[in-house]
């Protein structure tokens, strides 16, 4: 979400904008987010509104909010809708206390109301849009920066999980853990893999050891979202070529989406 907003801010300064806000336009390369959909770029037209706002909320903001406010992991919800979490649905889930926030009220409650009006009377909506006043570029920029500031402060609540605190709760004593670290380090030094896949990466401890000892790239996989989040923090903090993926190998994601 932050990467997308940073890119939007960068583009707007160059008088360009994005046509949409799909989360799938961002992939990861060497552990870092990269925007890949060049065809989404277009020239900024004076007074235009953010066309991808609704999609940004569904793909980025709403999944973060449902984790921050309701402690619900969003990952499996994307199976039901790869376009993300519907704003009208999120508005129904949130309670009155959640909605007191100015940001939540603005981006969820009000937007939900407008979307429902669009559904009830689409002709009137088209007419209103044609009569809208121009949206100043300064207002456009302020909206992007305000969203970035808010989102950067959101913290996802972590449920208790099996491997979320792997460093504290595992089957190794100090000696056996040290032996395993040496075995992994020696193996990686000998093989020198271009790409290594760590299945059941836990907190990413051995993924990092692999990179430190010669693996050029590591893909770390686990079904525990807390473990994956911790691994990503390690990757980000140490600037590693490490990509953590939330995957349950006993219940893999189906082949779905465009042309599937």
What are these regions (language model features)?
Residues 228-229:
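Short alpha-helix immediately C-terminal to the canonical SAM-binding loop
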Residues 203-215:
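Conserved SAM-binding loop of SAM-dependent methyltransferases across substrates and taxa
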Residues 192-202:
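Conserved class I S-adenosyl-L-methionine
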Residues 54-153:
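N-terminal auxiliary segments of SAM/dcSAM-dependent transferases
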Residues 154, 168-183:
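Conserved SAM-binding loop and adjacent beta-strand
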Residues 17, 22-68:
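Catalytic activation segment of kinase domains across protein kinase-like and atypical kinase folds
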Residues 217-222:
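Conserved SAM-binding motif I beta-strand of class I
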């Amino acid at each position: 979400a932050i990467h997308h907003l940073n890119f939007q801010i960068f583009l707007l300064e160059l008088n360009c904008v994005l046509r949409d806000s799909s989360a799938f336009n961002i992939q990861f390369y060497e552990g870092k987010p990269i925007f890949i959909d060049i065809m989404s770029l277009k020239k900024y037209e004076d007074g235009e509104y953010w066309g991808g706002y609704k999609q940004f909320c569904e793909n980025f903001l709403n999944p973060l909010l449902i984790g921050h406010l309701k402690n619900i992991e969003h990952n499996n919800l994307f199976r039901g809708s790869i376009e993300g979490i519907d704003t009208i649905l999120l508005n129904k889930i949130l309670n009155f206390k959640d909605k007191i926030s100015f940001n939540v009220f603005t981006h969820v409650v009000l937007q939900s109301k407008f979307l429902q009006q669009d559904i009830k009377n689409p002709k009137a909506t088209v007419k209103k849009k044609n009569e809208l006043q121009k949206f100043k570029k300064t207002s456009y920029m302020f909206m992007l920066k305000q969203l970035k500031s808010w989102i950067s402060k959101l913290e996802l609540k972590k449920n208790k999980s099996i491997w979320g605190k792997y460093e504290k709760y595992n089957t190794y004593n100090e000696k056996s853990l040290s032996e395993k670290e040496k075995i992994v380090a020696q193996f990686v030094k000998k093989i020198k893999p271009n790409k290594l896949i760590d299945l059941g990466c836990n907190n990413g401890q051995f993924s990092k050891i692999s990179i430190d000892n010669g693996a050029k790239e590591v893909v770390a996989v686990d079904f525990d979202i807390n473990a994956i989040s911790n691994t990503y923090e390690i990757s980000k903090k140490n600037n590693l070529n490490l990509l953590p993926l939330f995957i349950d190998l006993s219940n893999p994601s189906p082949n779905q989406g465009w042309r599937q």
